[in-house]
Amino acid sequence: MTDYSEIATFPRGAKRPAAIDELAAAIESDGGAALAAYQEPLGAHWQIFALIPSAMLQGTPFQRDLSPGHLKRLGEVMKKLRRFTEPVVVVRADGGYWTPNGNHRRATATRLGAKTIPAIVIAEPEVAYQILALNTEKAHNLKDKALEVIRMYRSRLEQSPRAIEKDFAFEFERAHFITLGILYDRTKRFSGAVYAPLLSRVDGFLAKTLREAAEERE
């Protein structure tokens, strides 16, 4: 394996986990640049600050669609500043990279010609499922939240059908988002706001496997 001792490390002199060096090697192999490894200040988790090839970076497959209006406004600001000042959050997945927080910035910078995107690369891929907690770039409306949740739900169902639904309460945030997501997905003109107040009081996470819970909710 390549020696990454030249990469800046914080705390200084700390021994990086093998998984972080492996991630740095993967980033370099993918044509990116691993610039620094550090422990973030809250949980002391190891992360990498890197430049990721824009061609290998995309939003997670289950998050909301890009907003044309937000892209336009963001593009105007970026054109004026000619700077990319906020790194996106990234996990390595499916032979590329997903950003659960920063997809509008990624898309805008790429459209403006950026070949690499500054990123905080997180070693734990499950962080990609914590979109609703992480994503402060653009406020979610009810439909956005519900559709993202049902996409995450179905992804988790495919990966781990025997996992228990209530164990994903943090990721899904509110149980009624699952139910509303099913309805929004089926009926494009569905008005979830009418039912959300009541549904939020009666819907809860189930102590059943995702397969069983999905069948019940469907």
Could you tell me what each predicted segment is?
Residues M1-I120, A163-R174, Y184-D185, R189-G192, ...:
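Short, charged/polar connector segments at secondary-structure boundaries
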Residues Y4-A14, E124, A128-E218:
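Solvent-exposed functional surfaces
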